[in-house]
Amino acid sequence: MISNFTGRLLLPKFRNKLCAFFSKESTSSNSLAKSKTNSELEGYTGKSNLLEKKKVGVFGTSTVPINTNFPNPKGVIGYDPDFSVKELVAELPNTRKTQGAKLAEEIKDAFSNISIEKPELLEDIGFVRHNEARVEYKFDTSEKLDLWKIGCDSDWKEGFSTCSLVNSDRGTAVFSGNISTRVLKDGRVERAGWASMKLEDRKTFNRKKFLSKWRNFSHLLLKVRGDGRSYKIMLHSPLSMDFTWGDSFSHPLHTHGGPYWQYEKIPFSKFFHTVAGRIQDRQYRVNLEDTSSIGIVLMDRIDGDFKLEIDYIGVYNDTTHVEDFAYETYTLPVFNTHGF
């Protein structure tokens, strides 16, 4: 019987009938599935905003290309920095106004600061006294608060956290929000739950301001009042090459919680090297000549509200602190896959 059935399969007439039968069944099942899908989606008007194009500005945004060859400094997947000529023309008047005012202020400061005395030169030869402190950033006005930008995973369509940075009645800054570790089910994001505030104090035409005047001080000084969470201080030092755009130096900021202020003095020698937030094997001391920004990040994997109040950020000098660098580093052998 099996041999007879196999022989019938080899006949062209029978084979054609069999193919026609299965193709008919497949067509009917596909049409049924399509009609069922259409009936389920009928009346659905929701729109997904996961693929919305991020607005790109010419100046003052974190998405500005560093140069024309590498328009994606953060390495974001699917990032498109292109914008139309119409958007560029519409933004030019505001850009010309803001950048012109900033340029005039720079020229005014350059001529007003002409003096025989050079404070930084005096500091370089040892004129910074013991226990001398200098406040660099206050938050008592809205103009000073505008120097800081905030962000969280929901801003990048990668999570559900929220954050805000506002002035308080006491002339301080309140960095608050909610951390959510719920992962977005898009098949790309693996973990979520972070929020940050970062200094974006730049010169005219988006030129960097370096924190080189801190080089003669031994500690970073902060006056904060937290909620018991552990934050992270980051000194950002990206250079011109693309493989250095994620370079930063980090140190934890442990807050006590409660109503009392805490004065945190963090030695610059204890900041460790990180790239995109990841600790590196090769460690070296932070070079403040290359540091152009400072940030505070929360990513402790704890869901819930957070609140950090900041009075000021500055520097402090302790002449008894002689430590150059607090950490050992892994030294590669002479012959290795990374070269000499």
From Swiss-Prot:
A single cellular component GO annotation: mitochondrion
Main location group: mitochondrion
Keywords: Chaperone, Mitochondrion, Transit peptide
Pfam families named in the record: CIA30 (PF08547)
Family matches, as SUPFAM superfamilies: Galactose-binding domain-like
Highest taxon in the source lineage: Eukaryota
GO biological process: mitochondrial electron transport, NADH to ubiquinone; mitochondrial respiratory chain complex I assembly
Localization annotation: Mitochondrion
One GO MF term: unfolded protein binding
Biological role stated in the UniProt entry: Chaperone protein involved in the assembly of the mitochondrial NADH:ubiquinone oxidoreductase complex (complex I). Required for normal growth and reproduction.
PANTHER family named among the record's database cross-references: COMPLEX I INTERMEDIATE-ASSOCIATED PROTEIN 30 (PTHR13194), COMPLEX I INTERMEDIATE-ASSOCIATED PROTEIN 30, MITOCHONDRIAL (PTHR13194:SF18)
Family according to the record: Belongs to the CIA30 family.
Protein name: Probable complex I intermediate-associated protein 30, mitochondrial
